[in-house]
Curated annotation (Swiss-Prot):
One of its GO terms (biological process) is Mo-molybdopterin cofactor biosynthetic process. SUPFAM superfamilies: Molybdenum cofactor biosynthesis protein C, MoaC. This is Cyclic pyranopterin monophosphate synthase. It comes from Stutzerimonas stutzeri (strain A1501). Substrate binds at L73, C74, H75, M110, E111. The active site is at D125. Pathway: Cofactor biosynthesis; molybdopterin biosynthesis.
């Protein structure tokens, strides 16, 4: 059953009024593939626009806080923790991992996915002048904890 449709098939925000407040957490990832020299430029701090990882981290955090403004039926949430980690993975990619937490009545999967996605988009934006062929890929939920459905983790 699709939770965002009412009995007539119309889009509607899920009513979480009667749901218990529980600890919720979600982990998402994204990857940006690029030319090896682009990654070297980022790692050496030689990018003319500044620290690419720092800006992407802040963009991801800000995006998680604004998820309800971007995705129409998401609830506005009082997130208690947002972490966005970026690391070089091999010679030609950056792996982004976002973790969102709260004590609340609905999950934080969309916030974690939005954080990872916007961090990836920010890397693309900052580096497109030197590498227009970058590819954003592998945006996915890795893990979700809390709520009625409990713990879910992606299968390896």
């Amino acid at each position: 059953m699709l939770t965002h449709l009412d009995s007539l098939g119309r889009a509607s925000m899920v009513d979480v009024t009667d749901k218990a407040v529980t600890a919720r957490e979600a982990v998402a990832e994204a990857r940006v593939r690029m030319l090896p020299q682009t990654l070297q430029l980022i790692q050496q701090g030689g990018h003319p626009k500044g620290d690419v990882f720092a800006v992407a981290r802040i963009a991801g955090i800000q995006a998680a806080k604004k998820t309800h403004e971007l995705i129409p039926l998401c609830h506005p949430l009082l997130l208690t923790s947002i972490k966005v980690e970026l690391q070089a993975d091999g010679e030609d990619s950056v792996l982004i991992r976002a973790v969102c937490k709260l004590a609340g009545q609905t999950g934080v999967e969309m916030e974690a996915l939005t954080a990872a996605s916007v961090a990836a988009l920010t890397i693309y934006d900052m580096c497109k002048a030197v590498d227009r062929g970058m590819v954003i890929e592998g945006v996915r939920l890795l893990e979700k904890l809390g709520g009625k459905s409990g713990h879910w983790q992606v299968q390896a």
